[in-house]
């Protein structure tokens, strides 16, 4: 059974579909954090037009966040999954095997990230919201001038009715 996670944000809602069979540990971490409310009220701290939107750090600095496994956990990189276009859900990291809670969604093809970041899902609906986020004004550190925030994240089993 596929797992979907819906994010209600200050700019609208979007849903991601998790690749449980391709990145089981990453998907379990992400879904568990979402279910626990870890991502609620967390800002998108880094937005780069035509590249990606990044969030998942409760400190809002881009340096924080932890996983359900402790501080950091290993990559689950697969050669058959690539950053081929907009809407790819991938883990942010600071080098090999440094995954925590931060993630990004691509706004365009980003092939230079292949083999460096764990891809664990894709945007299933609400890509227009993500594209609008990619257009917000930012400062010289790629931080939005007006806060863009996750209000609530919730796990939805695909195929189930709410």
Curated annotation (Swiss-Prot):
The keyword Isomerase applies. It holds the Pfam family Pro_isomerase. InterPro entries: Cyclophilin-like_dom_sf, Cyclophilin-type_PPIase, Cyclophilin-type_PPIase_CS, Cyclophilin-type_PPIase_dom, Cyclophilin_A-like. Its EC number is 5.2.1.8. Residues 1-155 form the PPIase cyclophilin-type domain. PROSITE patterns: CSA_PPIASE_1 (PS00170), CSA_PPIASE_2 (PS50072). It catalyses: [protein]-peptidylproline (omega=180) = [protein]-peptidylproline (omega=0). Keywords: Isomerase, Rotamase. One of its GO terms (molecular function) is peptidyl-prolyl cis-trans isomerase activity. It comes from the Eukaryota. It is an enzyme of class 5 (isomerase). Gene3D superfamilies: Cyclophilin-like. GO terms for biological process: mRNA splicing, via spliceosome; protein folding. One of its GO terms (cellular component) is catalytic step 2 spliceosome. Belongs to the cyclophilin-type PPIase family. PPIL1 subfamily. PPIases accelerate the folding of proteins. It catalyzes the cis-trans isomerization of proline imidic peptide bonds in oligopeptides. PANTHER family: PEPTIDYL-PROLYL CIS-TRANS ISOMERASE-RELATED, PEPTIDYLPROLYL ISOMERASE DOMAIN AND WD REPEAT-CONTAINING PROTEIN 1. This is Peptidyl-prolyl cis-trans isomerase-like 1. It comes from Emericella nidulans (strain FGSC A4 / ATCC 38163 / CBS 112.46 / NRRL 194 / M139). The lineage of its organism: Eukaryota, Fungi, Dikarya, Ascomycota, Pezizomycotina. The gene is cyp1.
């Amino acid at each position: 059974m596929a797992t979907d996670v819906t994010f209600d944000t200050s700019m609208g809602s979007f849903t991601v579909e998790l690749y449980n069979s391709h990145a089981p540990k990453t998907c379990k971490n992400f879904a568990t954090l979402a279910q626990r409310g870890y991502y609620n009220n967390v800002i998108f701290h880094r937005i780069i037009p035509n590249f990606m939107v990044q969030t998942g750090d409760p400190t809002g600095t881009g340096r924080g966040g932890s996983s359900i496994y402790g501080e950091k956990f290993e990559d689950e990189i697969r050669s058959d999954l690539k950053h081929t276009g907009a809407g790819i859900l991938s883990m942010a990291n600071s080098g090999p095997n440094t995954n925590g809670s931060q993630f990004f969604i691509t706004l365009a093809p980003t092939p230079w990230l292949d083999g460096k970041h764990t891809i664990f899902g894709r945007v299933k609906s609400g890509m227009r919201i993500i594209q609008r986020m990619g257009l917000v004004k930012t400062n010289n550190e790629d931080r939005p001038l007006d806060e863009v925030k996750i209000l609530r994240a919730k796990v939805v089993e695909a195929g189930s009715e709410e």
